[in-house]
């Protein structure tokens, strides 16, 4: 592994192929998609999170990594900040944002990059936890979303995680979900 030039104490780079990026983006879209309805219940006419998931799917299927894809991630992130949203809906939008942003994972051996690989899954699980606690979805909470994310992770997700340090501490409830999923996928 080579160090990133001109940056003291920069993390080493890792191998990261375009096929792996596409698989990770598709996985992230699959994780975010089931919770989109939580957002759409609160703001039915706001398509930003769904557009972000759709853009991630286009990239995963072989489409180009464009500025529009990056903008869809930012738009979903901004949608999560709408004041009228329930906490579950906000995390659903964050899951969508992470799905589109997964195409921009950096090839750095940094624990922070784990959050980019698993962020959509963790935010989707948190959205389900919050919706379940509020009695608005009929799911068993975030455990179901984490189990789905673990069981449906493609080989590329596990392979890339194996090149990265373990998920970092912190990040509140979503950070705890990232660490739990990271640990489950490394076993």
Task: Describe each PLM feature range.
Residues 109-187:
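Preference for long, well-ordered alpha-helical segments
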